[in-house]
């Protein structure tokens, strides 16, 4: 599935966090790794220094992969001139890239912030391929021999959220790791107008209000729980038929991102796979909502599947 993996780098230490993750994936899938740097036009005089750096990095990657994979992988270096957003998108579209792995934050603006006007945001909702985002601190937190040991797949019951399912299945099958399906059952709560809102529509509530809501609505409607369970069992059966080890979890809450982050901690998840289209579309899942919050406050690598990639 991942024949070509693109690693956009800005030559900062933060951006190099992707190297061990990409090495492990490439070793398992036999992928070609492409190290990609976009330089400013005015830095032509020192391009040879950029190339030297990337060549040393490529050699390190090859040596690391030899330790875990029976066959070596190809590591290619590309340097372009221009802006990262445009150059990365052009490379993806013209070179049959299957996956992008990049740091969620670096020294030159590859970052998710309060507003998503960044390279990462542009790439995530523009390119027609999955994008894996790694937080720099994550590499410092894990002491595991393998970086990918399990996978968390949040679903919201919508057709769009299930776009992540085929990718999750391919990743789990290729890495031979189990999948945990996850669904949050919405706790309804009164709005300022007296009507009731659903937690999946995601609004900010303060801690005191959240405690009141959860105490007043501590139990999920039995029929709703049965419906959710039936949905997850259907997906679980499909994955098991394809040789994937799979289980499921259901929690109740009002903040989907918070529940995803918590369950990833409880299960010590190594990868979260999500579609960038949720119940309310791209703007709801990516632009200032669930996926952004999971990335910003969570520590687990996030694999985002744009609807165009499905």
Region spans (language model):
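Short, structured motif recognition centered on aromatic/hydrophobic residues
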Residues: 7-8, 21, 25, 33-35, ...
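Intrinsically disordered or low-complexity boundary/linker segments at protein termini
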Residues: 1-17, 72-73, 99, 104, ...
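Acidic, proline/glycine-rich short linear motifs
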Residues: 24, 36-60, 184-230
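Structural beta-alpha unit
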Residues: 67-100, 105, 234-272, 309-310
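Glycine-rich, Arg-bearing micro-motifs that act as flexible, cationic patches
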Residues: 103-125, 146, 271-296
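Protein-protein interaction modules outside structured cores
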Residues: 258-262, 277-285, 293-302, 306-310
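Short, well-ordered secondary-structure micro-motifs
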Residues: 45-46, 113, 144, 191-195, ...
